[in-house]
C-alpha cells in the first residue's frame, strides 16, 4: 500500500469508493426468488432492532417493486429535501426508511432501469440521504443476485452479513 493511502478507506482498483455514511453494521436481506417473505423479514428485523433502542435505517432497494413503505403504513409520506440531502421518512424516533416508492409519482408504474441507473440510485440512497448516525442499516434487496446486491456490497461500508430468506420448495432455492 502506498504510504499516502495507508490507513485510508479505499476501494480496490476499478471499484467505486465506499459511501461515507456513519453506520456500524449493514445487513443485507435477499432471496433467490420473489414472494418468500424477504421484505417482511427486513421490516421485522429493523423494527425489532429499533424496539431494542438501536438507531436503525431501513433501505428498500427493490427498485422494481418497492413495498416497505406500504408494509409500514407510510406509503403516502415523502422524504423532505434539505439543501442537497433527503431526509428519510421516520417511522419512530429511531427507525428511518428510504425507498424508491417515495420518489415515484405512481407506484403501480414499472421502473425499467439497467445497471448504471440502478448503481446511481443506490449511490444516491447511501450518500445523499441524511441517515445520521446508525447502529444498523437493513437493506431489503430484490429477488435474485443482480445489480442491486452486487452494488450494495461494493458501495456500503461495514457490510456485516446477509440474511437469505427462502421457503421449503425446490424452486425457492434455485
Which positions does each model-derived feature cover?
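Conserved catalytic-core segment of NTP-binding enzymes
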Residues: 131, 135-174
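Short, well-ordered alpha-helices that flank and scaffold nucleotide-derived cofactor binding pockets
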Residues: 47, 51, 127, 154
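Short, ordered loop/turn segments at secondary-structure junctions
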Residues: 34, 61-64, 102-103, 143-144, ...
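Phosphate-binding loop that captures ATP/GTP phosphates
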Residues: 55-108, 112, 119-121, 126
